[in-house]
Amino acid sequence: MRFCPKCGSFLKVKGNKMVCSKCGYSDHDVEKVILKENVAHENDKTIIADGETIEGRVAISLCPRCGSVRAILLNKKKRLYRCMTCNFVYNI
């Protein structure tokens, strides 16, 4: 989360820059920004991977190993995911 150096408001990402909606300040240094957004999860699904049954919700989460955005939410409280492409288990 980044804040405007002029007025202290939250900076929003617009295209390839960050913009303050209050005073209009813009910053082109967005390569360090990680965007997260809430996604409505699909209904629970059962997935079979490598002969192992995995139950969970299909979610959009970036896998740190292969870069895929499809994952199974294994544990919501611990934010534990399993990548649907490479089966890597990670948390965010």
Curated annotation (Swiss-Prot):
Induction: At least 4-fold induced following infection by Sulfolobus turreted icosahedral virus 1 (STIV-1) in strain 2-2-12. Undetected in non-infected cells. Induced following STIV-1 infection, protein is detectable by 12 hours post-infection (p.i.) and increases until at least 24 hours p.i. in strain 2-2-12 (at protein level). Its cofactor is Zn(2+). GO terms for biological process: defense response to virus; DNA-templated transcription; negative regulation of DNA-templated transcription. Zn(2+) 1 binds at residues 4, 7, 20, 23. GO terms for cellular component: DNA-directed RNA polymerase complex. Binds 2 Zn(2+) ions. One of its GO terms (molecular function) is DNA-directed RNA polymerase activity. Residues 55-92 are annotated as: ZR-C. It comes from the Archaea. Residues 1-31 are annotated as: ZR-N. InterPro entries: DNA-dir_RNA_pol-M_15_CS, Zn_ribbon_RPB9. Coiled coil: none annotated. Changing residue 78 to A: Mild decrease in RNAP activity. The keyword Transcription applies. Keywords: Antiviral defense, DNA-directed RNA polymerase, Metal-binding, Repressor, Transcription, Transcription regulation, Zinc. Zn(2+) 2 binds at residues 63, 66, 83, 86. The keyword Metal-binding applies. Strain 2-2-12 is a substrain of P2 that is highly susceptible to infection by Sulfolobus turreted icosahedral virus 1 (STIV-1). Interacts with RNA polymerase. A potent inhibitor of RNA polymerase (RNAP) probably involved in viral defense. Destabilizes the transcription pre-initiation complex of TBP, TFB, DNA and RNAP, inhibits abortive transcription initiation, productive initiation and transcription elongation. Increases the RNAP KM for NTPs about 50-fold. Overexpression of TFS1-tip4 (TFS1 with the active tip of this protein, phenocopies this protein) in S.acidocaldarius MW001 leads to severe growth inhibition. Belongs to the archaeal RpoM/eukaryotic RPA12/RPB9/RPC11 RNA polymerase family. NCBIfam families: TransFacS4. This is Transcription factor S4. It comes from Saccharolobus solfataricus (strain ATCC 35092 / DSM 1617 / JCM 11322 / P2) (Sulfolobus solfataricus).
